[in-house]
Amino acid sequence: MRYKNFDNFDINLFSNSKKEDELFSPRKNMEDNLNYILGTYLPEFKTSNVNLLFYGNPGSGKSFLSYCIAKELLDKGFGVIYKTADELIQDLINIRFNNNTTLENMLVDCDLLIIDDLGAEQKNELSVTELFNLINKKLLKNKRMLVSTNLSIADITKIYSERFCSRLLGEFKLRKFFSDDIRIKLNLKNNKK
């Protein structure tokens, strides 16, 4: 996580060319996301109760930006837990069947729980129920979350229950990400050297 921070964030990786189905270029979109995070979300983190949902295509900067936020908050002394959705489901099953209250309290009470790659986890009634219960507990305790997903809003509403979607889409600030896959772009650039 050391190199995944705002100092190493390169806005020039994002194209200035607007795609016809989007209102802005990928660079303008990312600038807007960065301006919100650096200008509002992080400065007001201690006093506000904003949950974020980053959604968009793979490689568009969601996970990198999530790491940047985590590092910034950890450096300021906040408690942050970063889990992929799949890892989190395994933890929630552990909590349920092993009565692991220590782990449950950590997940519920941390200042920020980051759930990366929602939609990549194995979905069944138990996993969706446990994930819903955790999100609901955190919302009731005014504990913040950041969720990232490659799913569109339409896909989220098709895959998850109405109750789950109501919490996720009704209680989270939605931030859209789009661009060419930056991971591929960086890998191709590095392989040319």
Predicted regions and their residues:
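Pre-Walker A (pre-P-loop) alpha-helix and adjacent loop at the N terminus of AAA/AAA+ ATPase modules
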Residues: 8-52
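Short glycine-rich substrate-engagement loop in P-loop NTPases that contacts/grips substrate
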Residues: 18-31, 55, 74-109, 122
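Conserved alpha-helical scaffold flanking the Walker A/P-loop in AAA+ ATPase domains
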Residues: 39-43, 91-113, 128-137
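Conserved catalytic network of the ASCE P-loop NTPase/AAA+ motor domain
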Residues: 44-46, 75, 105-108, 136-141, ...
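Walker A/P-loop nucleotide-binding motif
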Residues: 45-66
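P-loop NTPase Walker A phosphate-binding motif
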Residues: 64-78
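Loop/turn-to-beta-strand initiation segments
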Residues: 78-79, 109-112, 141-147
